[in-house]
Amino acid sequence: MKAVYPGSFDPITYGHLDIVNRALKIFEELWIVVMSNPRKSPVFTVEERVEMISDLVKKEPNVHVDSYQGLLVDYLRSRNIKVVIRGLRAVTDFQYELEMAIANKSMCKEFETVFLMTDERFSFLSSGLVREVASMGGDVTKWVPPNVAEALEKLRSKGKQFML
């Protein structure tokens, strides 16, 4: 069975990768889909995020990385995928994710959302926190893979403003 793990991944963190690894224990094939979110001002372009994630999962033959702008249900239909994976850190995540799952289900009854609890080591971690700490020159290497930490430092050294 195939599943989609959608998100903005701006940037991808070890918390996201924990969800990827655990989803692979349940599903035969996983599509990580970088979604364009009009409510967010990303630090990295969609293409940069796809490239960073692709580098991280290149040794996983059953993981594919893609991008999409539009409704998630349309992407699922186009790939004939019926399951969405969502990671949860806390109760506050659950409220938002539940609303999204219900909205997706109302648009297409055949789709299911599977919630995976984030490992407790990453329960505090968010892309926003990573961006905030990195923008001030802080060490984020415990929270993101080396290629992501390097990309963040490169942006900071060029004076790019990180939107929080």
From Swiss-Prot:
- Which Pfam families does this one have? CTP_transf_like
The GO annotation for biological process reads: coenzyme A biosynthetic process
Q: In which pathway does it act?
A: Cofactor biosynthesis; coenzyme A biosynthesis; CoA from (R)-pantothenate: step 4/5
Q: Name one GO cellular component term.
A: cytoplasm
Please list the GO terms describing molecular function. ATP binding; pantetheine-phosphate adenylyltransferase activity
Annotated compartments: Cytoplasm
Establish whether keyword Repeat is in the entry: no
Spell out the reaction equation it catalyses: (R)-4'-phosphopantetheine + ATP + H(+) = 3'-dephospho-CoA + diphosphate
The residues that hold substrate are 8, 40, 72, 86
Q: Which cofactor does it need?
A: Mg(2+)
Q: Where does ATP bind?
A: 8-9, 16, 87-89, 97, 122-128
> Which residues carry the site feature described as Transition state stabilizer?
16
Origin superkingdom: Bacteria
The protein's assembly and partners:
Homohexamer.
Q: Which NCBIfam families match?
A: coaD_prev_kdtB, cyt_tran_rel
What the protein does comes down to:
Reversibly transfers an adenylyl group from ATP to 4'-phosphopantetheine, yielding dephospho-CoA (dPCoA) and pyrophosphate.
- State what protein this is by name: Phosphopantetheine adenylyltransferase
Q: Which organism is it from?
A: Pseudothermotoga lettingae (strain ATCC BAA-301 / DSM 14385 / NBRC 107922 / TMO) (Thermotoga lettingae)
